[in-house]
Amino acid sequence: MPTTYVPINQPIGDGEDVIDTNRFTNIPETQNFDQFVTIDKIAEENRPLSVDSDREFLNSKYRHYREVIWDRAKTFITLSSTAIVIGCIAGFLQVFTETLVNWKTGHCQRNWLLNKSFCCNGVVNEVTSTSNLLLKRQEFECEAQGLWIAWKGHVSPFIIFMLLSVLFALISTLLVKYVAPMATGSGISEIKVWVSGFEYNKEFLGFLTLVIKSVALPLAISSGLSVGKEGPSVHYATCCGYLLTKWLLRDTLTYSSQYEYITAASGAGVAVAFGAPIGGVLFGLEEIASANRFNSSTLWKSYYVALVAITTLKYIDPFRNGRVILFNVTYDRDWKVQEIPIFIALGIFGGLYGKYISKWNINFIHFRKMYLSSWPVQEVLFLATLTALISYFNEFLKLDMTESMGILFHECVKNDNTSTFSHRLCQLDENTHAFEFLKIFTSLCFATVIRALLVVVSYGARVPAGIFVPSMAVGATFGRAVSLLVERFISGPSVITPGAYAFLGAAATLSGITNLTLTVVVIMFELTGAFMYIIPLMIVVAITRIILSTSGISGGIADQMIMVNGFPYLEDEQDEEEEETLEKYTAEQLMSSKLITINETIYLSELESLLYDSASEYSVHGFPITKDEDKFEKEKRCIGYVLKRHLASKIMMQSVNSTKAQTTLVYFNKSNEELGHRENCIGFKDIMNESPISVKKAVPVTLLFRMFKELGCKTIIVEESGILKGLVTAKDILRFKRIKYREVHGAKFTYNEALDRRCWSVIHFIIKRFTTNRNGNVI
């Protein structure tokens, strides 16, 4: 929403050489600033005590003991409730997703509603004649024993696969479009912005969004679209944290405490999605809270929520194997120093993947906004049909991505040369015919290229969509293809561990698309338990990060989406060239000198009128408080600053009718205690910030930026010799910073408009051919 200054007839100060940042509101880098409310972290810290003090005083006699007990237990009750709900939703998502995916290939003989894991839970191993916990790659025994019925025939399985894929995608996109539009996409970018101090639309973390995201996400994944659940898991987990804290801590919730709960919940979302609790905690530190100080309190809350959430998930046991990890992989053959060049090559691939896939995805998002925004449902149906049609004939694309990676990560032969896996990938040796080798190698390469392209066009469609697992799937097929070449032409069989190459490739692409390092390393270890490959993994991730850094990419896909969508976000410090440019400008040039001010003494009726008039006309969000004796002066002295939301809350607490409001005086410089029992007088001193952050006119913009980032304030007063000159807001300085970047370096993202028009012409021609008859009428 607009900044806190508005034009009035009598501006304060001369306003010479002021840069009007509002004229740049419509540039892409700032297009959605008005959808966010800047949070004044300093002012928010005092809100609960000041606004609720009267109510607390009146009720303290009756609620004292209950409140003491609640005060001691509320943190753990809130954290535990949040974690348990997140764990339950994660268990539901896993079971529901697997059920829908399995329906595309068969059904349970005794109960159609059971997925393959539950249906085959009691399968008897023909070798040991014992009932084992089902392992992903032992499911063929379930079919052999008649517990699971696969679709038979040559055409029927294909038709069922296609129909269910399109149906699942259709239901998912309809739910998002017509019921909860905020449930679309990943949600990580918006959460990062929210945590950094810019509050988004309340519906984004609302109950309806939580429900639809939890239902539409498994439908989208089951449709076969190249989307993952990890990003949306962060979103639904954050919804849980937000809703439960608002409900349980509504009387004492401040921004800083809410930030801690939201960060902890987001980390738990990653923890339950990957089965990686420590990785989830690190994700909250490295990704979500990167623009904020991650203190020990936040770290502890993140740890506790991840612990309880993952314990809840283990109790539910959605995989029916007693574990919470996606892949049960063990590598007992150590790596060799001679393999380091190959590890470096995998890291280079991960860096290039992150660079180009994010770039192409951003270009396609621009194309979608320009030409496809009116047909979101049709776009999803087309993508689902295309994906299913291509994937059906390739094993590594047809399978669910996590199941496919389970195959690719698996170790074929142990150190004693005994086979642990019967997949055809493990039947290749020096005696394998070249045609068979090329068939599997080509299948892996095809899956790599097609999956990467599908990620480009699928991420951002009108369904819940993550990009972590699809990127890992691309890296896994590439890494396994590389291992085939190494075994065939360099090392020979039984020397390297092919599954480890898939594992390292997945880590490379995950790091490439997210630009995360420590988080990726820990998540990959928790996913697989492959601790023997810690050094190769660190090499791969380091090389990936080096490639991204040398390419000028400083953030992952979430950070780039923030810029693409024009969200406000206080980025890390600017480079030297940008800092030198900003040093030339001062607060005087950036500030707004046209303000609405409030005198320290004012009638309640005037205050109400000013409050609601500003709401309708200007959407002002704060007011400087000035001395009474300066009421008719051009130069005013500022004694404080009050947020509009605090002012509205305080006025609502007053039991004053409209007639009495005309004679009731409000004192911003006195409290009710100071006024005593004076009739028709109210003290508002408790909601006024008596020491707002202020600077001189000559302060450089670079210093202002650091103040906003480190202090977390919403506005900074510009004064000179005690005289109020203007205001600078966080959005002002962000607009200015991005404007100057655009002037010096050009647009952050450039698009080939001519190519977009040609592509749209082709698409439009095809659509027209299939939707009109010979007479030109729509079919």
UniProtKB/Swiss-Prot annotation:
Residues 1-75, 176-177, 225-264, 320-336, 391-436, 487-500, 553-779 are cytoplasmic. Its main location: Golgi. Keywords: CBS domain, Chloride, Chloride channel, Endosome, Golgi apparatus, Ion channel, Ion transport, Membrane, Repeat, Transmembrane, Transmembrane helix, Transport. Proteolytically processed in the secretory pathway by protease KEX2 within the first extracellular loop. However, both the N- and C-terminal products of the cleavage reaction are required for assembly of a functional channel. The record marks 230 as: Mediates proton transfer from the outer aqueous phase to the interior of the protein. One of its GO terms (cellular component) is plasma membrane. GO terms for molecular function: voltage-gated chloride channel activity. The record marks 136-137 as: Cleavage. The record marks 287 as: Mediates proton transfer from the protein to the inner aqueous phase. Gene3D superfamilies: CBS-domain, Clc chloride channel. It holds the Pfam family CBS. The chain crosses the membrane at residues 76-96, 155-175, 178-198, 204-224, 265-285, 297-319, 337-357, 370-390, 437-457, 466-486, 501-523, 530-552. Residues 591-659, 688-744 form the CBS domain. One of its GO terms (biological process) is regulation of iron ion transport. PANTHER family: ANION_PROTON EXCHANGE TRANSPORTER GEF1, CHLORIDE CHANNEL PROTEIN. Belongs to the chloride channel (TC 2.A.49) family. Anion/proton exchange transporter involved in iron and copper cation homeostasis. Involved in intracellular iron metabolism during growth on fermentable and non fermentable carbon sources. Required for proper copper-loading and maturation of multicopper oxidase FET3. Important for adjusting intracellular compartment pH to more alkaline pH under iron limitation. May also transport chloride ions through the plasma membrane. Homodimer. Interacts with GET3. This is Anion/proton exchange transporter GEF1. It comes from Saccharomyces cerevisiae (strain ATCC 204508 / S288c) (Baker's yeast). The lineage of its organism: Eukaryota, Fungi, Dikarya, Ascomycota, Saccharomycotina.
